[in-house]
Amino acid sequence: MEALKQELKEKIIDVLNLEDIKLEEINDNDALFGDGLGLDSIDALELIVMLDKDYGIKLVDPKEGKVIFKSIETMAAYIKENRAK
Amino acid sequence: MSRGIAITGMGIISAIGNTVEENYVSLVNNKMGITTIENISTVHSGEIKVGEIKKTNQQLVAELELSPDNNFSRTAMIGTIAAKQAIQEAQISSINEYKTGLISATSVGGMDMTEAHYYDYFEDENLVKYISCHEGGDVAHKIADELGLKGMVTTISTACSSAANSIMLGARLIQSGKLDRVIVGGTDALAKFTINGFKTLMILSDGYNSPFDDNRKGLNLGEAAAYLVLESDEIVKKENKKVLARVSGYGNANDAFHQTASSENGDGAFLAMEKALKVANLKPEQIDYINVHGTATPNNDLSEGRAIVRIFGEEKAPDFSSTKPLTGHTLAAAAAIEAVYSVLAIQNNVVFPNLNFQTPMQEFNLIPQTTLKHKNIEHVLSNSFGFGGNCSTLIFSKSE
Amino acid sequence: MRKTYINGLGCISVQETFDTIFLEKAEINENDTILPVKTPVYKDFISPVAIRRMAKGVKNGIVASAMAMKEANVSTVDAIITGTGMGCIEDSEKFLKAIIDNKEEFLTPTSFIQSTHNTVGAQIALGLQCKAYNLTYVNGSISFESALLDAKMKIEEEEANIILVGGIDENADYTTSLFKLAGFIKRENEGPYKVLNATTKGAVYGEGATFFVLENEKKSTTYAEILDVEIINKLDVNEVESKCSAFLEANGLQVSDIDTIVLGFNGDVEFDPYYKILSENSFKNTPQAFYKQLSGEYNTASAFGLWVGAKIIKTQEVPEIISVNNLEKPAYKTILLYNQYKGIDHSFTLISKC
């Protein structure tokens, strides 16, 4: 689980071009959207593609992302539960 | 006082007809043009439906009698067909007799050719001619050349509101006396580029789009072209021209909220409608019909609906409908298509039905007109909103 | 009728055109066929969260517009009007390649969104929280002039007092390789690529973002008044002179009233005759300037041309690096600009000192 969280942080920084943010600045329970990391709905769509591409998880409704992408913690838990690859 | 700039001709080709007449017949008979895609090979063909013009590029080339070495994109071909019809209805024989311009609109331009040949250009020198047809301006040049037009030619590209802005600019050019006559409208062919683009935004419906329905699931893309001829009152008088209707109001505003999504309260839409009413010198209650943007994405219809409530009041909204269940969302051409439909509504005194509607939205009490309704129509308001918060409203009015 | 004044400029180009006066640091590169912009420090103008998804054209547009607004000392505008021939083509390329290479799978929206032509104008509006009129023109080499004409009309209609107008285009690798294939860009190994009296086809390509703050009032920062703009889709070489005189006449002027003509020479032997006919005939005795040896050719290079024209009026000099014929005038009051690309999309723009 810890490794997965670390992996997610790296991927988020890479996929979303967060070049100014360091790995250790993202805490597992920090809000990714809104006031936290400041991500927005386009980032959510990028993350949905990442779930599909890297973990074989297909979301059909972008609204599902709201809950899943709340924090690194929630993302990791969801991926662990649902991953197909 | 004049009721606006005279419209003396229109032309259209869409998924529901190859002429103005055919489009009207489909509109009043609920004949949807949304089908499985045939002309483009895409991996998504099983899961999406589109509003496609059922003519191949070869058929379009033949219809336009283009030479074999032509480099017309599909966008340019359907645009030329619509523009020629418009000129014909306006009975223009000598196009450069007056100061005449062409204000076109497109979002994909020649992308259909670019995506078809992208990696092949270096392999096949016969394809190289298509490199120059990629850009938006090429479409307008091709149409101008086919019409023999020499003068001011330009193109607007503000995503899905593009053609509304070209109609607005055309009206202003006549109003200011810079031009006597202007052909305005837009054209967009279906392309893998837009199909996949909208797919990444997760706003494509897997079924038939159902605007203003609580269970709406997104849009169907479409392809179409429509052009209108606007002429000065001097020409109309001198040549005793028949005026189909008038462009009486227009407004553009920016939502300044998000790159693709509309704001919760529809600020941009509200400002655009407010501006258009002001230009037309009309009160909201004078609008008889709203041809809404109504793409059937969760976000658009909520935002547009809220803006309508703000302008008209929830209980006093006029009859409204989206015609996109018939045509699909034709992007940069949409506002020109819907301008033609607005004029048809005025000419025939009808409100076209909003198909596929079942369940009212929870957020407000706005119910679209779901059946064909006959009543006197003096003024139609037409909305078109695009990416980048680009919101435009046009108002069309009966001439006398 | 209300007048239109240029009250602020911002220019990101192949040359150092920010933090400079007027091309004093300009250098002519005659060895390359593609000229990249000198990039400003973007992060001085755009927040890190906002910048991460922005295309090159968006970033340049935001910086150039911010510079123009700063110079004009305005914090808000009544309209944002842009011109771009190809839009953010780098992102269009990226998305299209992804579609083809990944067979329409695992695509993400960012580059699709950026590829929409009005993305620069939209992002400027978003940054300024400006809900006003916002339009984008995309018509080859008159994309910028269309925006300029619209802006002038807006001021005349009394619909706006302060308008941001700009032209933006960017180079992208695959597209430039296609343009080389099609012969739009000069072949390699045929240099030095001189713009005047060139003997080869095609042009050296550049990129840039040039913005102007236009206002209905003259103020201390005013460069010039925009008198008129005309756009014509197509002309034969032998029609240029008569069109040009008709344009001047419509503004109550004749050739002798023009203190400098700024010509869009791009070194394409096939189409430079459009400029030569003016240069060698009617305007033989007029100071002439050219600029694409500095900016490179691109759809909105003529915005760089207007920047040059405005600077000539402000500084009252035609720097040697842009002079065609080394003629001088005691004062530079009225300037005419003429541009076209491949014989289409012609524009005449007239500005004057006020």
Language-model features, listed with the residues they occupy:
Chain C
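Catalytic nucleophile serine of serine hydrolases
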Residues: G140-S143
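Conserved "HGTGT" condensation-loop signature of ketosynthase/thiolase-family condensing enzymes
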Residues: M1-L135, E145-L149, M153-E157, I168-C354
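Alpha-to-beta junction loops
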Residues: E159-N161
